[in-house]
């Protein structure tokens, strides 16, 4: 039986508590937004299927808690991730400064070749913005990772952020698979096996 998708990508949303990770996930997966803030406890995930260059891609997006006390819980979810979106709040400089710490978490727990994306959320709060776009862009460029500013509230660049990540992952996997050789740790065309949170590197 043929699966209803060509690829299954596991994505993670990480970053300090309160930067809007859950809001980004809800906006992308369900096209909803809530002003009320409830901290994520541990992890949660949603699935959305997209079309990209004629291929059907199922995105399994994990929303992780930003609080320190959940780090040991969420660290296991880095393994097997194809892409990780690091989110900060453009109105909170500390959350941007802590991006380096989150990147260290990725280096420690995730696969070496995992795709990364830097996202500055809450771009609609122009009057409260303290992290300059060019500063964040220069930082991302120095790490050779894509960067976007988003607004989950206004749905600005949210779709583009996840599509950018999916495109980057697909390009990497396609480039690393010139043949149809199946690697159990990679998601290849026609693969219907679900991704385990404890699976190996991709």
Curated annotation (Swiss-Prot):
SUPFAM superfamilies associated with the record: P-loop containing nucleoside triphosphate hydrolases
Residues spanned by motif Effector region: 37-45
Entry keywords, A to Z: Cell membrane, GTP-binding, Lipoprotein, Membrane, Nucleotide-binding, Prenylation
Source domain of life: Eukaryota
PROSITE patterns: RAB
Residues lipid-modified (S-geranylgeranyl cysteine): 201-202
GO aspect biological process, one term: Rab protein signal transduction
Gene3D superfamilies assigned: P-loop containing nucleotide triphosphate hydrolases
Pfam families, alphabetized: Ras
Coiled-coil portions: none
Annotated GTP binding sites: 15-23, 33-40, 63-67, 121-124, 151-153
Name of protein: Ras-related protein Rab-1A
Organism per entry: Dictyostelium discoideum
Lineage per the UniProt record: Eukaryota, Amoebozoa, Evosea, Eumycetozoa, Dictyostelia
């Amino acid at each position: 039986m043929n699966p209803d998708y060509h690829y299954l990508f596991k994505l993670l949303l990480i970053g300090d508590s309160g930067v809007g990770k859950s809001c980004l996930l809800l906006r992308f997966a369900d096209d909803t937004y809530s002003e009320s803030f409830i901290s994520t406890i541990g992890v949660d995930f949603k699935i959305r299927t997209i079309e990209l260059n004629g291929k059907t891609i199922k995105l399994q997006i994990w929303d992780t808690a930003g609080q320190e006390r959940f780090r040991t819980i969420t660290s296991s979810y880095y393994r097997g991730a194809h892409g990780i979106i690091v989110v900060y709040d453009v109105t909170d400089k500390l959350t941007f400064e802590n991006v380096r710490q989150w990147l260290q978490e990725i280096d420690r727990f995730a696969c070496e070749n995992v795709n990364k994306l830097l996202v500055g959320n809450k771009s609609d709060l122009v009057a409260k913005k303290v992290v300059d776009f060019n500063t964040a862009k220069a930082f991302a460029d120095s790490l050779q990772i894509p960067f976007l500013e988003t607004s989950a509230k206004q749905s600005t660049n949210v779709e583009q952020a996840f599509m950018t990540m999916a495109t980057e992952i697909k390009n990497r996997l396609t480039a690393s698979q010139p043949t149809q050789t199946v690697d159990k740790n990679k998601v290849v065309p026609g693969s219907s096996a679900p991704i385990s949170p404890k699976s190996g590197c991709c």
